[in-house]
Design a protein with these regions (language model features):
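Bacterial Sec-dependent N-terminal signal peptides
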Residues: 1-6, 11-38, 249-251
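N-terminal targeting leaders for non-cytosolic proteins
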Residues: 23-134
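Buried hydrophobic residues that stabilize the cores of well-folded domains
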Residues: 29-44, 105, 162, 176-187, ...
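Short beta-strands within extracellular/lumenal beta-sheet-rich domains
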Residues: 128-149
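Short, solvent-exposed loop/turn segments at conserved positions within beta-propeller repeat blades
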Residues: 132-133, 170-174, 233-235
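Leucine-rich repeat
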Residues: 142-143, 167-169, 209-211
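Extracellular ligand-binding interfaces
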Residues: 146, 154-199
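Terminal, low-complexity interaction segments
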Residues: 177-251
């Protein structure tokens, strides 16, 4: 009888270990030769993210973490169907610039830290917000359309964002990212917010953003909202950097 109990206990422990292992998140790090090849040669107007700047016909820039998390992204299109980074999108980068006061849109892919999260080199830079001129914003999605939970990712501000906001933010100003999760029918399943600037103070280091509250989703879109406006619209640059996206494996 004792042997039977021991066998049953061993089976239970093994099953528990298997379950825990299956629930360990898979991390999208943006590291490796595939991702290095997706970093444009210049931060603004480069061939990868903008294509032919004279013709303005767009580019086929996209990425797909095919053998890992299954996440993918493409650039947003304008009214003519041209996919260009200024319409919104997710760009791989390794640019660093700590002199934020001198950073403008030509340094849009740089961050003021020593590199990606946890000592890595690469990261991803989001551009885009929903407004009267732009009905879409950058997004990531699971290419196989199978819903998964994004547990968290790590966020920091870009050098361009800080170079602008540090000069204009008052003690009451704020900027936030609104992440919206969608199912396979493009129906909203959840939202989550993260403040890049709050009470006039902006983050300048990698900070964890828990996203599991979105639940299982197929796509997550990132919208930038801010209290800092003028007569033309939002003046806070609609950018943020992120890294180490943790995805719970599909069951």
């Amino acid at each position: 009888m004792k042997k039977i109990y021991l066998v049953i206990a061993a089976i239970i422990i093994a099953a528990s270990c298997t379950k825990n292992e299956s629930e360990q998140p898979i991390i999208l790090t943006f590291e490796g030769s595939y991702w290095n090849a997706l970093i444009d040669g210049v931060q603004y107007g480069g061939e990868l993210l903008y294509g032919d700047m004279n013709a303005m016909t767009g580019t086929q820039y996209s990425w797909y973490d095919s053998e890992n998390t299954g996440l993918a992204s493409e650039l947003c299109a304008d009214a003519n169907g041209a996919h260009i980074y200024w319409n919104g999108g997710e760009a791989i980068s390794n640019y660093i610039d700590k002199n934020v006061e001198a950073c403008d849109y030509t340094k849009q892919l740089a961050i003021p830290t020593d590199g990606g999260h946890n000592g890595s080199k690469n990261f991803c830079v989001h551009n885009g917000s929903i407004n009267d001129y732009s009905p879409t914003t950058g997004y990531i999605y699971f290419k196989d359309t199978q819903p998964r939970i994004i547990g968290h990712l790590w966020v920091t501000n870009t050098s361009y964002y800080l170079g602008t906001v540090n000069q204009i933010a008052t003690a009451s100003d704020w900027t936030k990212i609104v992440a919206t999760g969608y199912d396979g029918n493009d129906t909203v399943v959840g939202t989550s917010e993260f403040y890049l600037t709050k009470d006039g103070k902006s983050i300048n280091e990698w900070t964890k953003w828990e996203l599991s509250a979105l639940g299982a989703c197929v796509k997550v879109a990132f919208d930038i909202q801010s209290s800092m406006h003028n007569e033309y619209g939002m003046v806070a640059p609609a950018y943020f950097a992120y890294d180490d996206v943790a995805v719970v494996p599909a069951k």
